[in-house]
């Protein structure tokens, strides 16, 4: 099993603080905020599949926003009352990585949710590299679009 220090070395300081200590990257600084290439987003810690570019939208909030995870079972929701706010924290199911928060102000036509996710918690797998990266089983989600 990977130690915390080995994990920090593998994913970097910011990703470690975000995923392991629920830190938040500064708005408009993450690499995936204004990024709309075709592919999937996985947990930077475990590689578990989380979100698709098909469900990503520009919310203007300063962080990547998604209308839903690829499958709802891939994330868990937790009550968060930190910083004097009442929010719903989103974590990856397998690794328990802090990803961000979910809000009820997303596009109505897409279900009304906005998953506001830290770029540092994600790794993007481009569509044309999904097979060689071990995500071939997820290629079919793009056939439906």
From Swiss-Prot:
Q: Could you tell me which species this protein originates from?
A: Streptococcus equi subsp. equi (strain 4047)
Annotated HAMAP family: MsrB
The record ties this protein, via SUPFAM superfamilies, to: Mss4-like
Protein origin, superkingdom: Bacteria
Q: Does the keyword Oxidoreductase apply?
A: yes
In Gene Ontology terms, what is a biological process of this protein?
protein repair
GO MF: peptide-methionine (R)-S-oxide reductase activity
Q: Which reaction does it catalyse?
A: L-methionyl-[protein] + [thioredoxin]-disulfide + H2O = L-methionyl-(R)-S-oxide-[protein] + [thioredoxin]-dithiol
Which UniProt keywords are listed?
Oxidoreductase
User: Which gene codes for it?
Assistant: msrB
S-S bonds: none
Cleaved signal peptide residues: none
Q: What is its EC number?
A: 1.8.4.12
Family membership: Belongs to the MsrB Met sulfoxide reductase family.
InterPro entries, per the entry = Met_Sox_Rdtase_MsrB (IPR028427), Met_Sox_Rdtase_MsrB_dom (IPR002579), Mss4-like_sf (IPR011057)
Active-site residues are 116
Recorded GO cellular component terms are: cytoplasm
Q: Where is the MsrB domain?
A: 4-127
Q: What is this protein called?
A: Peptide methionine sulfoxide reductase MsrB
